[in-house]
Amino acid sequence: MSKSRSLVRLLQLASPMLPVGAYSYSQGLEWGIESGEVHDLESAQAWIGDVLQVYQGGFELPVLSRCYRAWQRGDVEALNEWNAFYLAGRDNAEALAESRQMGYSLKRLLLEFEELSGAWATMLEALPNASFPALYAGISQAWEIEEQDALQAYAWSWLENQASAAMKAVPLGQVAGQKILLGVAGKIPVLVEAAIQMQDHEISNFCPALTIAGCRHETQYSRLFRS
């Protein structure tokens, strides 16, 4: 696949139009708003930036990198191990349900793409209970999207969804949403490079405030976002 075509595929994968339901989750941010921790542009940017740095950079992006390499090698065993590792690291019911639902939705979509066949389809069949990052890595590799580009697109999509959630729930205006993107996006290239270079034993999902926020959101009385 040509580089220009891979870029188009990358944009498709990173698009908010990707029908996996990411827009319906706030990943604990809505509880941060309910608690008063997030209440304006500055606090929203701080919350989102911290989660990107600690959780995305320390856990999701490194796992995504491992899944990408497993697809690249055709290593079904490693792919299943990292998929299970990721699901085990989703340490509250809401986060686990989110990843399973998004993974299920992405898998259904991918099965409609006739160009994805052969060894790729065989590995997909051998991946029961697939998480969203495991499938995202697979489609990135199948579409010949470079590992670094795939990770940056994944992080950008997450950031864009978080900014959108803040705009809806704080609420914030569109200019404020763009300021969040400008203020936080600069971290992405550094975090992606660190994720690729990270040793397996350094990967950690330790982000207790995010975990607590997810647990509290499960029973939040009034909410816009899915639990």
Curated annotation (Swiss-Prot):
GO terms for molecular function: nickel cation binding. Keywords: Chaperone, Cytoplasm, Nickel insertion. GO terms for cellular component: cytoplasm. Pfam families: UreF. It is found in: Cytoplasm. InterPro entries: UreF (IPR002639), UreF_sf (IPR038277). Gene3D superfamilies: Urease accessory protein UreF (1.10.4190.10). It comes from the Bacteria. UreD, UreF and UreG form a complex that acts as a GTP-hydrolysis-dependent molecular chaperone, activating the urease apoprotein by helping to assemble the nickel containing metallocenter of UreC. The UreE protein probably delivers the nickel. PANTHER family: UREASE ACCESSORY PROTEIN F. Belongs to the UreF family. Required for maturation of urease via the functional incorporation of the urease nickel metallocenter. This is Urease accessory protein UreF. The gene is ureF.
